[in-house]
Amino acid sequence: MANTYTSLHYHVIFSTKNREPWITPDIEARVWRFIGGIARKHAMTALQIGGVEDHLHALVTAPPILAPSQIAQILKGESSKWIHREFQLKGFSWQDGYGAFTVSTSNVPQVISYIQNQREHHRRKTFQEEYLEFLQASGIKYDERYLWG
C-alpha cells in the first residue's frame, strides 16, 4: 500500500490516588478541557472526556505511534502538574495504573454517551463495580488483590 490508514480509538480510565474525591464539580470542566488540550498537543483527538470526583474516562483517537501506555502517561503526567499548579491541590495525584480499552468506530457514539452520563451512572454503581465490568467484558484476566493498590 502507498499510504497508512488507521482508526485507533481508546477508552482510557484512571482514578485519583486512593480514589480520593479531588475532581470536584467546581473544577471538573476546566480539568476535562485541559486534558483535551493535552491530547491535541500530542496528536490525539479527545472525542469525549469526563468522569466524577474520583476518576476520569477519556475517549481518544490516537496515531499509531502512541501506545496506550504512552497515552495514559501523557494525560496523567501533564494534567497532574497542571492541577497542582492551577488549583494548589498539594495532595493530588492520579493512581499508578490505568485501563485502556479499544473501541470500534461503530461504538464511538455509545462510549461518548456513556462518558457524558457518568454522574448519573455512578448514582447506581461504584467505580470499582464499573471497572470490574470493563475488565470482565474485555476478557482481561486480573487478580483483585492488585487492582486497587
Please annotate each region the language model reported.
Residues 1-149:
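Basic nucleic-acid-binding interfaces
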